[in-house]
Each structure stands twice: as structure tokens, then as C-alpha cells.
């Protein structure tokens, strides 16, 4: 009596024919994919800038990133900011605020600081600019940290249901 008598998929049919379920699934997947891609790009660029020893305000900017990990603006000021930016009731409220994460920037920066500076110096001697050095030398070597941060961001985006209720 614990097992169903007739095997049926009618419950799946009922659920999948509801438009709001499909819309929610599409939004969740799009949010996770776009949020992960945008976050990887912005965090990697910021981490590269901070990891370069010749960057003028390197230590001050790193300190700023660490402080933002511990001090939060609060829920109400965040909501007011999102309203002023016209992000509420928009898909982009899920993607734009998560584009930069202090923790992920510091993880990437630490990884990039571990790469030999001779790679960058030899590319400069060959005439490469900073963007070329980043895209052709540093970025391919950072695939392990990109994968790690991508998992952090994707799981965080997928599991973040509270902001969908708020904004």
C-alpha cells in the first residue's frame, strides 16, 4: 500500500504546463549563467590590476576590498540604491550587484601573485601591452582559479532565492 498502483507522469505534465514554473526555470538558468560569466570577467580584471606590483594604489585598494568583506551597507540602503538605479523588478537586479565580490577578487589576486613575474616581463620586452599580457598569458594560466570562482559564483547564484523575494 506504500507504492503507487499505476505508474504515471501526469504530475510532471501538470507542473510543466504552468507558465510560471517554466519562466522561473529560465530565469534561474539565465541568472546563473550570465551572473557567473559577468562575475568572472569583472573579478579577473580587478584581480589582475591589484596583483600587479607596479600598480600605484595596490595596498590601499586591497585594504578597501578586505573592509568591504566585513562591513555591509545593510538591506534598506541596498534596496534604496537598487530603486535609484531602476533595478527593482528587473532581471538585472540578479546579475549586476553580484558582478564584483571582494572574496573572489582576493582569491584570484592571490593566485595571480603566485605566477612568475618573468612571464609578464618577457611579454613586455616583446612589446605586449597590459591587455595582451592579461588575455594571452595570465588568463590561460588562471584556469584553475577561474573554475574555482565559477563554482562559487554559480552555486551562490543558483541558491540565492532571498533576493528574488526582495527585489
Per-region residue spans from a language model:
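A hydrophobic, multi-pass inner-membrane permease signature
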Residues: 1-167
Amino acid at each position: 500500500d506504500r507504492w503507487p498502483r499505476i505508474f504515471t507522469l501526469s504530475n510532471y505534465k501538470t507542473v510543466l504546463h504552468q507558465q510560471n514554473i517554466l519562466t522561473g526555470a529560465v530565469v534561474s538558468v539565465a541568472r546563473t549563467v550570465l551572473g557567473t560569466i559577468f562575475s568572472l570577467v569583472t573579478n579577473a580584471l580587478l584581480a589582475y590590476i591589484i596583483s600587479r606590483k607596479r600598480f600605484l594604489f595596490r595596498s590601499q585598494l586591497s585594504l578597501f576590498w578586505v573592509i568591504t568583506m566585513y562591513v555591509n551597507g545593510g538591506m534598506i540602503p541596498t534596496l534604496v540604491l537598487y530603486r535609484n538605479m531602476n533595478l527593482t523588478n528587473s532581471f538585472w537586479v540578479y546579475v549586476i550587484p553580484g558582478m564584483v565580490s571582494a572574496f573572489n577578487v582576493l582569491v584570484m589576486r592571490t593566485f595571480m601573485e603566485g605566477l612568475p613575474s618573468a612571464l609578464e616581463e618577457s611579454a613586455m620586452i616583446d612589446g605586449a601591452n597590459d591587455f595582451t599580457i592579461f588575455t594571452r598569458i595570465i588568463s590561460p594560466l588562471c584556469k584553475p582559479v577561474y573554475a574555482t570562482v565559477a563554482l562559487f559564483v554559480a552555486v551562490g547564484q543558483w541558491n540565492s532565492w532571498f533576493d528574488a523575494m526582495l527585489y
